[in-house]
């Protein structure tokens, strides 16, 4: 996705510790046209797979996930990082550690919304170590559903996440692959190569 890659290069802010801040279009302020293109790209990858549900984790995965679900014309389900008092039914649950926040969250989805009949695409805003996507995959497995693939908006290719997902047998589609975050600069995979 050339437009996404351009936005990451132009508007992304590199923070010490291998963190990329993209709050101007993805995880604080959202560019809906860009998120629509993200959803459309993921839809085109999995459109013949009988998708019945799009799954993400709150909060930054919701925008790309809902646009993906819109294209599929299926529900978007997001795992909650805390159990609200209104969630009184049985849930699937797992623990997910956030690389960026260095915090572990106990996440849940209602058993009413995820079943063995579902064919799921998992969406996440970032892929670093793969914890969020693997945690969501764990929820899919608990339900007996099928995970058709994982759509990632921004992948930090210099970290182990993608390999961990591939090792788990998952199909991974990354729309913007980052090779390095050095000296305040974003380097994309394939940049500078002949």
From Swiss-Prot:
Its EC number is 2.4.2.22. Xanthine binds at residues 20, 27, 156. GO terms for biological process: purine ribonucleoside salvage; xanthine metabolic process; XMP salvage. It is an enzyme of class 2 (transferase). It is found in: Cytoplasm. Pathway: Purine metabolism; XMP biosynthesis via salvage pathway; XMP from xanthine: step 1/1. It holds the Pfam family Pribosyltran. InterPro entries: PRibTrfase_dom, PRTase-like, Pur/Pyrimidine_PRTase, Xanthine_PRibTrfase. It comes from the Bacteria. One of its GO terms (cellular component) is cytoplasm. 5-phospho-alpha-D-ribose 1-diphosphate binds at residues 128-132. It catalyses: XMP + diphosphate = xanthine + 5-phospho-alpha-D-ribose 1-diphosphate. PANTHER family: HYPOXANTHINE/GUANINE PHOSPHORIBOSYLTRANSFERASE, XANTHINE PHOSPHORIBOSYLTRANSFERASE. Converts the preformed base xanthine, a product of nucleic acid breakdown, to xanthosine 5'-monophosphate (XMP), so it can be reused for RNA or DNA synthesis. HAMAP family: XPRTase (MF_01184). Belongs to the purine/pyrimidine phosphoribosyltransferase family. Xpt subfamily. Homodimer. This is Xanthine phosphoribosyltransferase.
